[in-house]
UniProtKB/Swiss-Prot annotation:
F(1)F(0) ATP synthase produces ATP from ADP in the presence of a proton or sodium gradient. F-type ATPases consist of two structural domains, F(1) containing the extramembraneous catalytic core and F(0) containing the membrane proton channel, linked together by a central stalk and a peripheral stalk. During catalysis, ATP synthesis in the catalytic domain of F(1) is coupled via a rotary mechanism of the central stalk subunits to proton translocation. Key component of the F(0) channel; it plays a direct role in translocation across the membrane. A homomeric c-ring of between 10-14 subunits forms the central stalk rotor element with the F(1) delta and epsilon subunits. InterPro entries: ATP_synth_F0_csu, ATP_synth_F0_csu_DDCD_BS, ATP_synth_F0_csu_sf, ATPase_proteolipid_c-like_dom, F/V-ATP_Csub_sf. It is found in: Cell membrane. One of its GO terms (cellular component) is proton-transporting ATP synthase complex. The record marks 84 as: Reversibly protonated during proton transport. Keywords: ATP synthesis, Cell membrane, CF(0), Hydrogen ion transport, Ion transport, Lipid-binding, Membrane, Transmembrane, Transmembrane helix, Transport. Its main location: membrane. It is a multi-pass membrane protein. The chain crosses the membrane at residues 35-55, 81-101. The gene is atpE. Belongs to the ATPase C chain family. This is ATP synthase subunit c. Pfam families: ATP-synt_C (PF00137). F-type ATPases have 2 components, F(1) - the catalytic core - and F(0) - the membrane proton channel. F(1) has five subunits: alpha(3), beta(3), gamma(1), delta(1), epsilon(1). F(0) has three main subunits: a(1), b(2) and c(10-14). The alpha and beta chains form an alternating ring which encloses part of the gamma chain. F(1) is attached to F(0) by a central stalk formed by the gamma and epsilon chains, while a peripheral stalk is formed by the delta and b chains.
Length: 101
């Protein structure tokens, strides 16, 4: 008997607290999606660094061997496209978080 009253009291207090907390959590989730979109945009930093290193390597390679400029340039463009895909994925995720969720 004592345990039943104790547990029902705890359950009533828990539900009372949740009825106060849940509306606040639901209003905060609207703001959390912007934080998530910002964190998803962090992937763009790696893309910028990667493309910078690709450009640097291509310039150094063309400077050392100018005859291979066309091959180096085509390889650089393909590598930059592959590197850019990470930024595009980050952008898509950020847009989905802002407008869909």
């Amino acid at each position: 008997m004592l345990h039943t009253a104790f547990i029902s009291n705890i359950l009533a207090n828990y539900l009372g607290a949740m009825s106060v907390i849940l509306p606040n959590i639901l209003t905060v989730t609207g703001d959390i999606k912007y934080i998530g979109a910002g964190l998803a945009s962090v992937g763009i930093l790696g893309t910028g660094v990667g493309q910078g290193l690709i450009g640097q390597g291509a310039c150094l390679a063309i400077g050392r061997n100018p005859e291979m400029a066309s091959k180096v340039t085509s390889t650089m463009i393909v590598s930059a496209g592959i590197s850019e895909s990470g930024a595009i994925y980050s952008l898509v995720i950020a847009i989905l978080l802002i407008f869909v969720v």
